């Protein structure tokens, strides 16, 4: 399969499932990974693996959620020194193809109160000169205020792939996002 992609007989349509950072040394979680060991674990000495730990401090800011939020905060002047273009090599949802696509809403997004689902009909057009399958991605941006439940700047809400499109052809796909996906919880 990989040979067919490299030869161009098959057009890839996958997208990155995570962000590819230039270096993990600039990621805030980097300092949390080491050979940390509990120093008061005499009762656990027979379970050597249990005496080691990794400090988890990132909360919701993992992978692309950290980088997208950091870029937004840097643009507002709240994160000095952060440069998205220098930190990220391939963003979340990035995909390579031997063709190009345009995306537009086929109609105004709707909400179905019976299923509590938002529906986004997206028209994807193959604007290149090779057949391929396009992907429509919808990202969610839920605003938050300081002191409220934290939210990442953007989160992938949903996606849908088209059928194979000849050059110039279009397909309309429906991306559904459940209302619960927008919900915030505070357990304090």
Can you annotate each of these PLM segments?
Residues 118-120, 136, 173-175:
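Hydrophobic residues positioned within well-ordered beta-strands of beta-sheet architectures
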